[in-house]
Structure formats: structure tokens, C-alpha cells
From Swiss-Prot:
Range of residues in the leader sequence: none
The entry's keywords: Endoplasmic reticulum, Golgi apparatus, Hydrolase, Membrane, Transmembrane, Transmembrane helix
UniProt name for this protein: Probable isoprenylcysteine alpha-carbonyl methylesterase ICMEL1
Binding sites annotated in the UniProt record for substrate: G214, G215, A216, Q285, S286, A287
Pfam families, sorted: BD-FAE
Enzyme's top EC category: hydrolase
Length: 476
């Protein structure tokens, strides 16, 4: 039965004022046939204070606001960018890699692959272990013994224990599947590596999702995206999970630089692995959503001629998917402090209080001097759970409203009762139908109804009672 769309209007905006489209999705055990759609008018004032740009660049894109209907899942939103003019960019600043080997998309050998050998990977793992141990000791000196941090750490242990059956199965897939290409080098900095998750079916170029993992800017790692990579690859989508330097190994500018280098590698080399360079989607989760948003905004500023030379084009990004992200750091500092990510640590990560505006995409796009970059931004689709206490869902709503008010394409989908980790971990481990997963697949596959309708048996990885307990003890 098609979803029922209920229009709820708090107050009608002027006809000349764009509105942000927001969808509320019910819990999986609620009535899935009911979807509430509300439009929010423009009550905000443009921030006139100068905002230092992240970095820069752009791509011409014009269109009207998306309209959602009960039948839009097959391609309503995809119409936003299907006719976008894509530019190819052969410029590649990452042409030399010292520890490359060969391999193919289907697990064989090919001269185009840059995957390390087992011996190199063991050596790399040992070096990384030593490095991360030293960094953890340094990190502990920042954290001290704050009671909030200690309680979160204990809750994290319980949470990981409850989901361990799923982690073991995903870990086995990650290390032993011939369709996972681990630790492909994309740059010359520490942790400049990415993992590729390849479909079993190698016919035809595949759409690609470049994924930036979360981890509070401190504990992010490329393997955190292995469950997403496995499940999307089962739907004939290539996933590139990009690793990056965490704090204190690097600060936010290093993270954005690494993410940009990883995206550049994907844009310039994904065809060697069976990917379609004209169908690339950028996705981030939690801190990764913030880093990815900073990266794409920085890129369009660069492209507009206000930054350094570029090695990839924002026009290659068909859409941005932001999962449970925060985009206005000024509004989140106190909240993070109350949750155990203390102000002193957070400001160190973000390179000082004076840099918070520079690394807040929601504020950067409102800079009056950067109005010309809006048309170059890809469509933004933001996903958030209404019971997310790590980063409140208002963060996504506010960013979407700001983008839409400025003329960019933006949509926020809220999932009723979902927490910070439900959408990314518990729901995928539950098996069966996953609303957010299907929402992503529908956009990525576009009008390919055959691929969208492909039946994939998503098996349960963790017993239901353990998932429910994990929901309650999650420190995120």
C-alpha cells in the first residue's frame, strides 16, 4: 500500500520563500504506511558576520525544490541531479604510490589496482598499532578522568559486548571476502588508505558511494563502514570507505584534507575497479558527516577560484548523504561538553574557538561573499533519528532549512524513535527491511527499477533482545 502523505503546516511561508522538505519516518514496529511530511518556512536571518571559507570551488546547478509524493521513491528526488552537467577532471595529484600491488574488482589480478601485499599490510598494521598506542596515551592526557567520559567508556564496553555476534560476522567478511579490497593507498599521509567493497556482479560500471566514517573525530576508522559496504555492495553499489587522521594525530583541517584526497582518488581511479565516475555519491556518518560536508563546501569554494588548484570536481558528486551529522559547531560545543566530549578537547580538535565558524558548513554557506557557490553544491539529503542524543536531529533540520533558504537542494528525513547508532548499526544488524538503507539505495540506483527491486536476503546478525539492550545502553 502506498505511503500516506500528511501535510502539516505550522505557518505558511510566503510563496517567494523556499521551504525545507522534511519527512518523518515511523519506527519499524510502528505503522510503516504512515509518513508525516511537514514544511518549515523561513524564520531565520542571514548571518552577516564574515565567515572564513573552509577551502573552495563550484559547479553550475539550478533546479526547483523537490516535491515528495507516495510514489517518489522510484525517482522523485533523483530528478534533481539526473540532468546535471558533469565535468571530467583528469588532473590527478596522487599519481605516485610507493607500496602498490595489483588486483581486480572481482578478486583477481589487474595492473590498475593499488592494494598492498599481505606482508606490507602486516608491517603497516604493526606500525599503525604502535602509532595508535602512542596517540591513545596522548589522548588520555587530554581526557583526564572526567566522570562523564568514564561512564561513556563503560557503556561503550557493554554496547560492544551486546553487538559482538554481529561484529564477529562482519569482521570475518571484512578480512576474508575476496570482494573487499583493504588498505588501498590514496595519499602520502599516515592513514591515507581506503577500503573498497565490490559487487559480485562485475558487469557494467557501478554507482559508487564514497563513505567517511564517524568516531567523534577521535576513534574513526575505515573498517567502521564494513557493514554498510557489505550491504550496499549486495545491491550492485561500490563503496569506498575512506580512512583519515584522527585527533590527536591530526586536527580538523587534516581530516578535511585527507577526506578530500580520498574523494579525489575515488573520482580519478574508481573506473579501474568497475565504478562509474559519473555516478559518485558522498556520504558521512556522525563526525564523518561533518567532515564530508566541510569537504564538499570547501571544494566548491576552491572551484570558484578562491582557493588552491583542485584534483577532483564537485560536479562528479551526484548527491551528499549526511547521517546523524552536526553542521553548526557553535550550537554543539556545550552539548558535546555535557555528553563527555569536553570543551577543551573539542576546541583542540577544531583548532581553537576562532575556527568553529570556519568548520561549520551551515555558517560558511551563509557568508554573503560566497553566494555564488550555492548553485554548485550537489543535492543534500540528511538522515537523522529523532531520539539521537549525541547530535540532536535539530542539527540536520537547521542545516537543511538553511540550504533550502539559500536556494540549494536539501531534504531531511527523520526516523521516529531512532538513536545515533540505531540507523547505522542496530537496524542493519536486525536484517529484513531497513528504511534508511532503502532510501539510500533508491536515490543511488535512480530509475533502474530492476536493480531497485532486486531481492536481497538481509539476514539477522544479532538476536532481537540483544539489539534492544544495545539501544538502551548505547553511549552515543
Amino acid at each position: 500500500m502506498p505511503s500516506q502523505i500528511l501535510q502539516i503546516s505550522h505557518h505558511l511561508p510566503p510563496k517567494s520563500s523556499p521551504s525545507t522538505e522534511m519527512m518523518f519516518k515511523s519506527l519499524i514496529y510502528d505503522d510503516p504506511s504512515t509518513t508525516l511530511l511537514s514544511r518549515f518556512g523561513d524564520d531565520h536571518h542571514t548571518i552577516s558576520s564574515t565567515v572564513k571559507p573552509l577551502l573552495s570551488r563550484s559547479s553550475s546547478y539550478n533546479g526547483t525544490a523537490m516535491k515528495t509524493s507516495s510514489s517518489s521513491s522510484a525517482g522523485g528526488f533523483t530528478g534533481w541531479y539526473q540532468n546535471r552537467r558533469r565535468r571530467s577532471n583528469s588532473d590527478n595529484c596522487l599519481s605516485a604510490f610507493s607500496d602498490d600491488t595489483n588486483g581486480t574488482a572481482d578478486g583477481g589480478n589487474n595492473s590498475g589496482d593499488r592494494q598492498t601485499t599481505i606482508g606490507q599490510e602486516v608491517g603497516h598494521a604493526a606500525a599503525e598499532t604502535f602509532l595508535l598506542t602512542r596517540l591513545c596515551l596522548k589522548l588520555l592526557s587530554y581526557l583526564g578522568v572526567g566522570y562523564r567520559w568514564i561512564t561513556r567508556f563503560m557503556a561503550l564496553g557493554c554496547y560492544a559486548f551486546l553487538l559482538m555476534p554481529g561484529f564477529i560476522q562482519v569482521g570475518y567478511y571484512y578480512f576474508f571476502s575476496p570482494y573487499v579490497r583493504r588498505s588501498i593507498v590514496y595519499g602520502d599521509q599516515p592513514r591515507n588508505r581506503l577500503d573498497l567493497y565490490l559487487p559480485k556482479n562485475s558487469t557494467g560500471p557501478k554507482p559508487v558511494v564514497a563513505f567517511v566514517t564517524g568516531g567523534a573525530w577521535i576513534i574513526g576508522y575505515k573498517a567502521w563502514g564494513s557493514l554498510l559496504g557489505q550491504q550496499l555492495s549486495e545491491r550492485d553499489i561500490i563503496v569506498a570507505c575512506i580512512d583519515y587522521r584522527n585527533f590527536p594525530q591530526g586536527s580538523i583541517s587534516d581530516m578535511v584534507k585527507d577526506a578530500s584526497s580520498g574523494i579525489s582518488f575515488v573520482c580519478n581511479h574508481i573506473a579501474e575497479y568497475g565504478g562509474d565516475p559519473d555516478r559518485i555519491y558522498l556520504m558521512g556518518q556522525s563526525a564523518g558527516a561533518h567532515i564530508a560536508a566541510c569537504t564538499i563546501v570547501e571544494q566548491v569554494i576552491k572551484e570558484s577560484g578562491e582557493g588552491d588548484s583542485v584534483s577532483w570536481s564537485s560536479s562528479q558528486i551526484n548527491a551528499y548523504f549526511g547521517l546523524s551529522g552536526g553542521y553548526n559547531l557553535l550550537n554543539l560545543v556545550d552539548h558535546f561538553h555535557s555528553r563527555g566530549l569536553y570543551r577543551s578537547i573539542f576546541l583542540s580538535i577544531m583548532e581553537g574557538e576562532e575556527s568553529l565558524r570556519q568548520f561549520s558548513p551551515e555558517l560558511v554557506v551563509q557568508n554573503p561573499n560566497l553566494k555564488h557557490i550555492i548553485a554548485r553544491l550537489p543535492p543534500f539529503i540528511l538522515f537523522h533519528g529523532t531520539d539521537d542524543y549525541s547530535i540532536p536531529s535539530d542539527a540536520s533540520k537547521s542545516f537543511a532549512e538553511t540550504l533550502q533558504r539559500l536556494g540549494a537542494k536539501a531534504k531531511v528525513i527523520l526516523y521516529e524513535g531512532k538513536t545515533h547508532t540505531d540507523l547505522f548499526l542496530q537496524d542493519p544488524m536486525r536484517g529484513g527491511i531497513d528504511e534508511m538503507f532503502e532510501d539510500i539505495v533508491t536515490v543511488v540506483l535512480g530509475d533502474d527499477q530492476e536493480a531497485i527491486g532486486k531481492s536481497v536476503d538481509r539476514r539477522r546478525l544479532v538476536p532481537e533482545f540483544m539489539l534492544k539492550l544495545a539501544h538502551w545502553v548505547s553511549p552515543f
